[in-house]
Amino acid sequence: MVNFLKKHKDLGWLSLFLVVGGLYFLSQQLPLDHRSVHCALDDKIPFWPAFCIPYVLWYLYIPGMMLYMCFRDPAIYHRQVLTVFPGMLLCTLIFFIYPTRIDFRPMSEGTGFFRWVCRFLYANDRPMNVFPSLHCFEAIAVHLATFASGYGKTHRAFQIGSAVLVVLICLSTVFIKQHSVLDVLGGAAVACTMHALAG
């Protein structure tokens, strides 16, 4: 195990998820004045519990893509690191400076697996610090960092599959009422900005 870690020292960058995650947790515990995020389009988007599946897949997509590229193509992995972690820090800084919340989550009452998953998410993911959406930022940032270098030209099916999942992840945030459309746009803006800065 020690030899494996010595050989793959770049895996250590993934420990930054714990650091930024700790800061995010702290931002949710502080008694900050959270401002409500809402737009008219949010009211027109229906609650669609089945979208909890791509929302949950985000938890596999982000570390999975980064781990895969760490072994498959270290150059792309480094670009992912330079795009994702500074962007996460920026988002967390925004959470401290401009704390936000949503107040339009439904009760998700009734039976069925999808509604149960939504209730579980609601119980464990507080509707605070929603702008910009970390779900959308990280999904878009990882996809851009992975395929912007031309990697997708030789791995077209992989690129298309990733793009479809990223779109579904972004849609899921509004269809299960975890985010406002404004949060999605904010996350996309941060992702594109960090991607451009990372080169």
Regions inferred by a protein language model and the residue ranges of each:
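N-terminal transmembrane-helix/juxtamembrane module of multi-pass inner/ER membrane proteins
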Residues: 1-63, 109-114, 118-120
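Residue-level signature of transmembrane alpha-helical entry/exit and packing/kink sites
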Residues: 9-13, 17, 79-80, 159-162, ...
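Hydrophobic faces of alpha-helical transmembrane segments in multi-pass integral membrane proteins
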Residues: 15, 19, 23, 82, ...
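Aromatic-anchored segments of alpha-helical transmembrane domains
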Residues: 21-26, 88-96, 164-174
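Membrane-interface loops
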Residues: 27-42, 47, 70-154
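Alpha-helical transmembrane segments of integral membrane proteins
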Residues: 52-56, 60, 79-83, 132, ...
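Generic transmembrane alpha-helix motif of multi-pass integral membrane proteins
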Residues: 64-69
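Membrane-embedded catalytic cores of phosphoryl/pyrophosphoryl-handling enzymes
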Residues: 119-199
